[in-house]
């Protein structure tokens, strides 16, 4: 009878977790937008459905997996903003439920599993709400580490088979932090396999890796994605930026030590228990607990380094509930006095930190630069188009006058709807193609003048992007280019001489450039 009640309780708790993790992300994703980030995969997914090819029809440095998966969601569920954010909500739900079952498998009290999972749902994808490559890749890396520790714990081959696939998908989402986590996981596996003589594991890992690579190569062939474009845009160009940023890292700086102090505090009990276990074990230092500890240590290092390199708002605080939970597991499994008090402290600490970051990143939407916005001023985005219905429109661009921004956008949509020539639009309002049901041939997902999205001057791949842009304009027979504020005309003129364009009159804060005969282009326009 008791066992049946526990099973019933577990099902109820899982149902609550499922609903909560979906709803909280869906709710906060509708709470204002930062156009450059909030719509990053919106138009791109629409363009893929309509035949555009990544690396060929738009410059791509990250997000390949998200783009195709979102295209699938649009194809199956419809093309609107609520379907778009449901994708992120589903990932939040998947990782939250997985966290619950991982903790339960490590024999943590079911109600603590429930509590820590809810905290995870609050700090997971919800801090962005909308699809974002750093969240997506980091959460997939966490899922890979879950597979690793379950393989170590259970010795089941299914986790070894899943591990390369998940890491591969994380890499196809964003090369960093997945590369850091890949090397971390590889180090742990090599140590474990050779120390424990689990050489059969190599077979499963190699077969799974080869199968995944073959599948991706076949998919690239099917999707007409050229490998040379993939290597240049997805690997070589981002690494040219990442090398410089890693070289500038100071591991003793305040950014690394103090900004992530709550992550370190949640990890300290796990560290101390592991040290005590190593001292006590003496000859059996490399037990499973040591490898669990090493897995989380290297994951923390990987994500902290990645977080600092991105130079974005913080997004890795979802580690805190996971680390608090595993610290509690380690404490319960070790002979320590007052272990219940330590467990209560971890629960209260996690509650405090989750509340703190929930208010800062979810309520204030700090990740998307909206911490100073009055959300009471927001307006239903269906005033722009019914496909954006449900989104409470307010942005950092027009923080005090969303109605004025909506009027501006409706004017732009009207102009683009009546444009009969082949047009290219350079804008961070990356929903215009889907809204007007017309490919606007944007050469990049987003426009950032710092050189992170595409090469700028002094980057060795500058000429490659220049040639890509000119080829795109020529191949698509573009006759007119619209540049919408806050994107600057320099995002075009740094690659193509302004003598190739004639400015035409249009609405305020929009540049309309007619393409003239020009030596830059292979054909007269």
Language-model segments: residues:
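Membrane-interface alpha helices of multi-pass inner-membrane proteins
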Residues: 121, 159-177, 181-186, 297-308
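Membrane-interface transmembrane helices that cradle and orient dolichyl/undecaprenyl
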Residues: 104-107, 144-160, 170, 272-284, ...
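Transmembrane-helix signature of polytopic, membrane-embedded enzymes
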Residues: 99-122
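Short acidic/glycine- and proline-prone juxtamembrane loop motifs at membrane-interface regions
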Residues: 129-137
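Specific aromatic-rich, kink-prone transmembrane helix
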Residues: 98, 137-154, 159-167, 186-190, ...
